[in-house]
Structure formats: C-alpha cells, structure tokens
C-alpha cells in the first residue's frame, strides 16, 4: 500500500498595502533604455499615475519619446501617421501600408483590407462576443468627446497597428478619465447603466504590425495578445488604478478563457510554482502566474462571473495610493457566499495535489497532466536520518505564499509522524495544518483524503512521503513568523501533550474569523469522513439561534450573518459555535459587536 501525505499550515490576512513598490523613476528608465523585462502596460500604468513627480530632465527624455504631460494622466501620444482604418462593431483599427509602420499588403480575398488586418478584425469580433455578450462586461469608455479625430474622437474603441519597440507584443495606454469634459461626469463610464464609476479611464490599444521575430504561430500570438490587452481596456472601464497583479492575473485568465487550446499562459506556471514562497499578489510579474489562482476558483468553486464581479466591486475602493485588491477580491467572493480564506487555502491544497482525477474533488485541475511542472519547489527535505524531534522556530513566511517541506518516510523504522504547530491563533493571525493522503496502490487507488488540525499524528508505516505546506495570512504585516515541531515515533506512545488521532476520525472546529465581528463571521471546520455534522450557534443562555448541517468532506466553511433562523438580526453579545457528530463535539466563543 502506498500513500503520499501533504500537510499545510495556513494563516489569514487582509491588510491593504502600498499600491506599488516599483518607483516611477525605475519605470521611466525602462522606457529610456528600452528595457523590456517588465510588461509595457505596467510601466505605462506607473508613469500614468506618478509621471508628474519626475524630474524635469527625465520628463524631457520621455517627451522626446512621445509622452504627453499636459493631462492629469501622463500618457504616450497616439500614432499620427496611420492613414487607413477599418471599423468592426465598436472597434476601429488604424494601420498604414507605407513606412516602418506598414503592415503586409497581401489581400488574398481582394476585399480591400490587408489579410493581416482582417485577422485582427476577426479576432476582435470574437473577443467582443465573449467579453460583452457572454460575460456581460461593460465596454470601455469612449473618446467621442475628444475634439481631435486623429486622437480618437469617435464612439469606436481605437486599436493602432504599427511598429512597436523590440520585444513588445502590444499594450493598452490610459489617457484620461472617462467623460473628463465635465467635472460632473469625470471618471464615469458612460456605458455602465446601473453604476457610477469615479476612476474609469479612456484608453487606446497598440498591436504590432507583424510578429515576424517572435516564436510561435503569428495568428495565435495575435489572438492571445488581443484578448489579454483588450481586457486591460475593459478593466480600466471600472477602475484604472486597480493593482497591477490583479489586472495581469485576470487578463491572463481571460486569454486562456478565450483561447484555451493555445495555452500560452503555461509559460508563467513554471516560475510561479518554482517560487511558492512569494505571495500570489507579490508584484505584477507574479500576477501573470497567479492567473492559476483564478482558474482554480472558476474551475472548482464559482462561475466565470466572478471575474466580472471583481471589477464591479473594485469601483468601491480607491486604489490610487493603496492596494485594495484583496478586500475587493474578498467582497466579490462573499457575493457568492465564498470565504476568501477558505478558497485560497483550498488553492494551496490543489497545488499540492496537481491532479486531474475526479477523486480530487474541489482540488482538481482538469489540465494538470499538461502543465509544464510538477509540485511546487520544496523548501527542505527531511529523511530517516534526521533528528527524532525537529523544531522550526521563527520561520519567516510572506502572506499569501507557501513553503513546502518533504518528509521521506521510506526505509525507516518509525511508524508515526507528529506535526505540532507551536504558534497559536491570535487576534492578528490564523493558522491551519492540513494533510493530504494520496492513495496509489491500495484498495482505493488515485483517491485522496484531506484533513485539517493544528496537531496531527499520522500513521506512516505504509506511507512513502509527507509534504508540509506552510502558508500565511495576517492582519497588519505582509510577513508572518511561525514555529512548529516534527516528531518521529517508532510506537504509538507519544509525548503527554500529544494524542494519536486516527486519520479517518480527525474532526476540527477552528477559531471563527474575524472575532469579534460586526457583520459576517466565517466558521472553518474539517470533516474527514462521510458523517452528518451539526453546527449550531447558541446564545449565552443556551438558546439555539441558528443551525447548519454539512456532509461535505475536507476543510469547509460557513458564513454567519448575525441573523437567527428566521432572518432576524440578533443583538450584540457573546455567542457559542458548537460542532458535533455522534463521536465528536467542539465549541468556540464568538463576540458580535454592532
């Protein structure tokens, strides 16, 4: 019999952080020296926001390269030498047949439009159907209020096809706040009927006049680049100052949604899994690989509508100077009765499995067999020759990241492995230890057991390896410290403060969060076997206020909105959460403050 066990330590966090750690001087320098190691759209976002803070000398350098400092938003000028255009739906495509910006004049169908432009036109027609008809996004703000037709000045969204700097596939440039011809309408996307934006922006898009020097099939490059970049224009129609990592992660998600067969997004996965110790929102470059987080959510936990809901929620947060991307994501998930902490933890579990088996349940990646990597990079490997008791003190871990430790249990005489989290829950931090048992060659091959507890004892007599995955969340810091110990035992006799817990009977009720609370509180619990579980909320006098039932295996959560079973809000005070089965009961106190 062969198993693999994976364990996770998880901590919770939602503090807004600085909107960008990349300085405007660094962004400007990348333009000046032609450095392409950062996506051009992110460089333009930083200059658009902070460009007026640059020194006169650097401003002059950028002006010489076509940047306009006359508006509140600093932007590059639109090309002025493209003498042809073709309209398709809401789009207008600008191009030329002469000079360095010329597209190939080949016109096989003799329709008067070059085949290269025809391909782009058809691509955008398909993109528009998915973005606006199927997914119901609001179209980007128009520039019809511009006085100069050469700068747009129509109701069409402008796409310019010309010779870009070496290495750039395409980009979207924010120019001005939507409807900035009036202080009353400034920042409001005129195409959103039921909402009023404050930071929506007019943009234009740039694509190359050819992709001859790029590896890959040109038509596929055009498709994924167009889907990705145009979604930036859509995003800017909600909040142009949203965090770069979130913009890029969801734009990569969108290109995969449009062109799932191309899988250009796979290029970002290897680095993402090679650096699990970096937060999913670490920086904009990390954001490209973080698309897999949203793929996990929409494949397993929620419909594709989540992506739209995120940007609808982004209207509520002014992210100009402060990164509110996590609160935005939390709010969007809550609209689907999903808890950010729970589903993010589930995401880390899924990364530890990387399985396309139906038995993986909500931790499944349907395309995992084609992913270009295996499990995330290991932080450390522990073997039979390691000490019997190992302590890990003051281990640093970035929020929204994970550390993976492998315990090799082959060729050893010890039978039990104890995982003991020494760092306890606090008002600022939450901790979880989750284990995954993968059955390979026993009576239930290709199945998994998933369970959670802060102290776990695992029978490893027939187990090949154990992987600990430590991940972190916290209130007021982007780093966390944790301590734990690992004990190897050759018998079932453990230390006095330990308990041997059969893997099939390990229930847990974790501390509800946040506590105290004033609107909603999330209650996390683990069910390791098929058995009805009753979760009830009582007042301090023992009266049952609300009851929940669950039979779903694994780590689960419910959100209580402070109302009784009749939907009537309860008063402030102390309440008791009780989880019980035929063989298990545990309670937690919670405090409702209004």
Protein language model annotation of sequence segments:
Residues 522, 549-583:
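Short, surface-exposed loop/turn motifs with a glycine/proline- and acidic-biased composition
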Residues 21-202, 208-230, 234-238, 432-437:
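Zn2+-dependent metallopeptidase catalytic core
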Residues 317-498:
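Beta/coil-rich, acidic/histidine-enriched accessory regions frequently appended to metallopeptidases
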Residues 4-13:
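Sec-dependent N-terminal signal peptides
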Residues 584-588:
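Extracellular and select intracellular beta-sandwich modules with Ser/Thr-enriched
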